[in-house]
Amino acid sequence: GREIDYMRISITDRCNLRCKYCMPDGIQCMPRWEILSLEELEAIAVCAADLGIRKIKVTGGEPLVRRDCPQLVRMLKNVPGIEKVTLTTNGVLLEQYLGELLNAGLDAVNISLDTLDPGLYETITGADALDKVLGIISRADRLPIPVKVNAVSIDFDNWKDGKERDKNGWRAMAALAEQYPVDVRFIEMMPIGYGKQFQGIDHRTLLLQLKEMYPDLETDHEVHGFGPAVYYKSQRFKGSIGLISAIHGKFCSSCNRVRLTAQGYLKTCLCYEDGVDLKQVLREEISRPEKESHFIWPEGLDVRDEGLQSRLRTVMEKTILKKPMAHCFETPGRITES
């Protein structure tokens, strides 16, 4: 069977960008009191480690809009059994928090970036911030932790905004692996959320085009992380190129992860809404008047309380054991995740 040893923890549903396929303008965010506190996240991490989780990825939204993100990284690094804590960010605030994150023990960072074209970047994200992101990537060889760049494989030429697009914009993204010691990973668009409205690029086609661009491209069997990417190397690379092909390279049989939403919902697959509300377990003893008064976060939570850990363990273990064997993205009618 699969060894589930990796948890993605979303610490906020807010973001400082408005990417059209993810969080476009007008999207409603949850009230802050609905989001898990640091202590609640720590309690879940302690239990997750007891259940075999060894690696944690901190995500959002944009995790760095939450100013206590470095503090959380430090807390997670101190949880017995947790071996690696990494971060996925859009990179806009990374320069501001990088020192704190490194001091907290962050092991690696993934930067989400879909284009190197300033105009297209602003069209996608609603922000003029590309230079900030590229500033961090350009220093990758001087950073003490590995840097990966995540690009969603979108057919921007099909965007219905009346502008002509560079059909080969992915080439500039791929070339980052020539310029810097970074892993550039192309991620197939999944038909969920706002992503359903956009046309993705088939990774079978993308791989053929990459091989034309780099005739000596070959599979790189070196371990680059904990995820499902298939990596490729070339003599021209300082880094590597990875393909995460959820649709045309289904990797469910080796999927090793579960996901915790910012509201405390533990999910086992992006394709299905099934899961369990851990926030309900964490806050079950808080009175209804307190809940309705929109308190910020419960105070004085003992994250290692045996009773709390026992209740969390029971529901988390049951949920993880029911992780689906495979997604159903190829049959959209069966998808239950909105």
Question: Where would I find each of the regions flagged by the language model?
Answer:
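Canonical Radical SAM [4Fe-4S] cluster-binding loop centered on the CxxxCxxC motif
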Residues: 2-38, 50-51
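Auxiliary Fe-S-binding modules of radical SAM enzymes
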Residues: 2-6, 172, 178-179, 189-338
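Conserved beta-strand segments that form the floor/walls of ligand-binding pockets within enzyme
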Residues: 6, 10, 57, 88, ...
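Glycine-centered loop/turn positions within well-structured domains
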Residues: 17, 118-119, 250, 276
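Residues that scaffold the ATP/ADP-binding catalytic core of kinase and kinase-like folds
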Residues: 18, 22, 66, 119, ...
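A short acidic, helix-capping loop that chelates divalent metal ions and anchors anionic groups
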Residues: 27-31, 117-124, 193-197, 277-278
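Radical SAM/AdoMet-radical enzyme domain recognition
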Residues: 38-58, 62-183
